[in-house]
Amino acid sequence: MPPGAAARDPQLPARLLRAEHDALLPILRRTPEPAFGRPTACPGWSVRDVLAHCGSALSRVVTGELHAFTPELNEIDVAERRAWPLARVLSELADGYLTAGPLIGGAGGRLDGVALGEWVHGGDVRAALGEPLAYESDGFCDACVLLGERSRRRETPLVEASLPGGDLQLGILKPGRPAATLRSSNAALIRLFAGRPVEPGDYRLVGATPEELVIF
């Protein structure tokens, strides 16, 4: 487990997206089409909508047609894809997982949040479909590296997290404020920092509120 800030690994985004490609796509290809209409943790979006957003974001990285990824602009991208056959949505996503990673890696950290967001959305999809390992699937350790980097960029309060696999520092030290402590499952850590619903019994946070940790 990464202890804190470290030199950026430009191969990490591609590695994380490849892991998600290899783990999530087989699940999606065996999922009955009606299940893609299930609601997710993303307000107003179905499983299909989340996947459409993921594919569109990766396509924008590949084409260089980036926008601010606000909720309004994301919804426009998703709405454009609601008329697509499901197979086309999944094809765009699969291609994006494999082609966007090196471009994100070469962007010097500016687009790392896209890679992390894609992996988190994979957790949203797994949770909605009742699949195991939601928010703790293959690539978890790489996702934690990006989570740490993003938490420092967003200047969330310093949190010393104790996880089943080791310890992790996130955020930055605030003047006059001691580090918060978090003991949680792997999935609860991601849920907290991504602003997803989390069972109170899955974590113990002292010295900060869940709302202060959200990085998206």
Regions found by a protein language model. Give the residues of each.
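Helix-loop segments that flank and shape redox-cofactor active sites
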Residues: 26-45, 67, 102-109
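Hydrophobic, proline/glycine-rich low-complexity stretches
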Residues: 2-34
